[in-house]
C-alpha cells in the first residue's frame, strides 16, 4: 500500500510537524473539503493497524530515518481533483492546509 502512493507528481504535503510536537495520534480526526464541501471525514482510529504497528512493520523492510514520510491510507471519499478546485485538509489539533489545484504536466 505504501509504494502505490509514491509516483511522480503525487502526494503534495503540508509543512512537516515534528512527532514530538504532535503528541498522541491515536484517535485524531482527519478531514478534507473540496470547494467547501466535505469529501472525506475520518479518524486515525479507523486504520486497520495503529501508527506504531505500521512503523514497526515498515522498519523491517526499510531503513526509516528522520524526515521520512509514510503514507497510510485515507478515509472514504477519494476522488479526482480538477485544476481550479480549492481544498482544505485538517489533521485535528496538528495542522490545517489549504490550497488550489493547478494545471501541471501530463503524466
Residue positions per predicted region:
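Catalytic-core "active-site belt" of small-molecule-metabolizing enzymes
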Residues: 1-61, 65, 69, 77-107
Amino acid at each position: 500500500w505504501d509504494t502505490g502512493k509514491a509516483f511522480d507528481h503525487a502526494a503534495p504535503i503540508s509543512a512537516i510537524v515534528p512527532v514530538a510536537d504532535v503528541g498522541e495520534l491515536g484517535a485524531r480526526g482527519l478531514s478534507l473539503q473540496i470547494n467547501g464541501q466535505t469529501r472525506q471525514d475520518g479518524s486515525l482510529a479507523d486504520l486497520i493497524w495503529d501508527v506504531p504497528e505500521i512503523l514497526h512493520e515498515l522498519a523491517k523492510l526499510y531503513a526509516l530515518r528522520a524526515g521520512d514520510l509514510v503514507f497510510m491510507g485515507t478515509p472514504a471519499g477519494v476522488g479526482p481533483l480538477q485544476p481550479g478546485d480549492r481544498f482544505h485538509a485538517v489533521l485535528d489539533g496538528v495542522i490545517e492546509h489549504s490550497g488550489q489545484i493547478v494545471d501541471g504536466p501530463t503524466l
